[in-house]
Amino acid sequence: MAVVKSKPTSAGRRHVVKVTNNDLHKGAPYAPLLDTKSKSGGRNNNGRITTRHVGGGHKQHYRMVDFRRNKDGISAVVERLEYDPNRSANIALIRYADGERRYIIASKGMVAGNIVFSGADAPIKAGNTLPLQNIPVGSTVHCVELKPGKGAQVARSAGASAQLVAREGRYVTLRLRSGEMRKVLTECRATLGEVSNSEHSLRVLGKAGATRWRGVRPTVRGAAMNPVDHPHGGGEGRSKGGRHPVTPWGVPTKGYKTRSNKRTDKLIVRRRTK
């Protein structure tokens, strides 16, 4: 994997920094594991915008990634690593001994030819998936379940990981990259190691159009709008009326807590620091 800076042959190329990986598959993805992906443009069934800054972008196929890793006791060989337009991490196409193929999130250091396992008896090796009760304290994990059997929900993006810092009774304690310490049931599964493509954060798109290719529309400052559109709108010159920064709906936007799920507060040992 290499970080390549473009030569300034044009204004749009001047700041581009790409992350290249010669180990990724050059051909088409595995067709039986593809699904259609329709775009909503951020609108709901009434045609109203419910998610801002969404629209356009290149047409994509969804890769059906196995986040449960529930095929226990059967070895699988990594056939190839692939690019996935739907996520920052790379994915791996694995083939089980019985012939079934699945996509999984590729872990750091995974290459074609690796053997991976899942289940309580799987070896302690990067890329293998085990229940948290079978993973040694101090291990680095990713693709962590929050409910047994539901599938991985935590630490799935490029370079992400969590550390298993304690085990007590029915729960283990994980330290997440955000600084949050969280309890998770020991029956939940996690994959050993870190997520691949950690250099993803080093890339620079270089121009607004590259962001539009990804289906992201521009973000307009509230102070640049009219009073009818935003609490900061209007005024002569640059002015936001002297009030603290808020969203278009008047909710404070810097440091204001909006988390409403009190039921799972008991599982958060320490709040995130970033």
Curated annotation (Swiss-Prot):
One of its GO terms (cellular component) is large ribosomal subunit. Residues 39-49 have a biased composition (Polar residues). GO terms for molecular function: rRNA binding; structural constituent of ribosome; transferase activity. SMART domains: Ribosomal_L2, Ribosomal_L2_C. Pfam families: Ribosomal_L2, Ribosomal_L2_C. PROSITE patterns: RIBOSOMAL_L2. Residues 28-59, 222-274 are annotated as: Disordered. One of its GO terms (biological process) is cytoplasmic translation. Residues 229-239 have a biased composition (Basic and acidic residues). Keywords: Ribonucleoprotein, Ribosomal protein, RNA-binding, rRNA-binding. It comes from the Bacteria. Part of the 50S ribosomal subunit. Forms a bridge to the 30S subunit in the 70S ribosome. One of the primary rRNA binding proteins. Required for association of the 30S and 50S subunits to form the 70S ribosome, for tRNA binding and peptide bond formation. It has been suggested to have peptidyltransferase activity; this is somewhat controversial. Makes several contacts with the 16S rRNA in the 70S ribosome. Belongs to the universal ribosomal protein uL2 family. This is Large ribosomal subunit protein uL2. It comes from Marinomonas sp. (strain MWYL1). The gene is rplB.
